[in-house]
């Protein structure tokens, strides 16, 4: 987002514990001790835990079980501010802006998205605990002091993007519930009178029925929607069944954003460069925010889960890449 004369990135910083040897896997978590939040370390020894799967660098799980049986994450994430005068060269603050609390974020904070409404910046983010990944809300006016508003979407629900103004008297947000049985991770749209209490949920968009498509695995919110003379533009992410993440875009009706006017058939950004295909979790481009200056769309995105990058588009080119839908 932009604040005064600076471009502000609110970055997820994932930190892990240095282990003594290759047999150890050390897990940082936040726990309440004598009324205070403290970081504690849980240590697994691979040789003593044959029932556990350590093959995924992101987490420890029960061997042979499904993803819902994750026991711990291997890192603990907080949110930290990076500042820039030109949108390219950033200085990262020395200390965290927001650190996880034991009650809501004992396993960390991820995927922050900033929506400016009037003079307040609302930050929704994924709050992770052993009970699942939900979405919480924080607000600020100056990026120095922050007010917590708690969980607004209970687990498992993430990839929330809030529209920057009321529509027909209510706040509107995309969200992405993750069903455990029937269904797939798909986009829903909800409404709220106050940004805290959300309801009127409606299914918005599902995954592609084409099993060879770039978006046949999962789909979710990306950047905060922005308004143009043609309607709302919503840049989103999707993945195929091999977890290759790309970005696409919707054009939505100004007065009813549940109506899709047009969408991109092919990705507008996909992992091609080495820094996008290789990394902590390769073949990923994933955005949580963008800026719009005149006809230019500036997307800040994560690459391979361990870098932050920038890509610029002409808005006219984005519209030209869309296929319009008969309503």
Where are the model-predicted features located?
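Beta-rich carbohydrate-recognition and catalytic domains
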Residues: 2-107, 115-161, 165-217, 227-280, ...
């Amino acid at each position: 987002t932009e604040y005064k004369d600076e471009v502000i990135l609110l970055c997820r910083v994932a930190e892990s514990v240095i282990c003594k040897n290759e047999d150890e896997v050390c897990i940082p978590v936040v726990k309440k001790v004598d009324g205070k939040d403290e970081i504690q370390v849980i240590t697994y020894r691979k040789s003593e835990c044959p029932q556990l799967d350590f093959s995924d660098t992101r987490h420890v799980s029960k061997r042979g079980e499904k993803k819902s049986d994750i026991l711990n994450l291997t890192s603990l994430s907080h949110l930290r501010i990076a500042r820039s005068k030109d949108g390219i060269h950033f200085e990262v603050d020395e200390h965290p802006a927001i650190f996880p609390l034991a009650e809501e974020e004992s396993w960390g904070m991820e995927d922050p998205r900033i929506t400016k409404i009037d003079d307040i910046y609302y930050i929704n983010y994924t709050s992770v605990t052993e009970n699942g990944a939900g979405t919480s809300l924080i607000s600020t006016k100056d990026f120095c002091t922050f007010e917590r508003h708690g969980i607004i979407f209970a687990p498992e629900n993430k990839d929330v993007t809030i529209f920057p103004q009321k529509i027909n008297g209510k706040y509107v947000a995309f969200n992405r519930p993750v069903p455990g049985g029937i269904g797939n991770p798909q986009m829903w749209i909800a409404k709220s009178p106050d940004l805290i209490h959300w309801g009127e949920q409606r299914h918005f968009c599902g995954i592609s029925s084409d099993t060879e498509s770039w978006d046949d695995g999962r789909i979710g919110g990306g950047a905060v929607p922005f308004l143009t003379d043609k309607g709302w533009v919503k840049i989103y992410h999707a993945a195929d069944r091999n977890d290759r993440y790309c970005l696409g875009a919707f054009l939505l009706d100004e007065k009813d954003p549940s109506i899709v006017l047009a969408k991109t058939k092919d990705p507008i950004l996909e992992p091609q460069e080495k820094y996008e295909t290789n990394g902590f979790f390769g073949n990923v481009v994933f955005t949580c925010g963008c800026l719009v200056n005149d006809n230019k769309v500036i997307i800040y995105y994560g690459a391979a889960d361990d870098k932050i990058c920038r890509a610029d588009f002409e808005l006219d080119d984005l519209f030209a890449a869309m296929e319009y839908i008969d309503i």
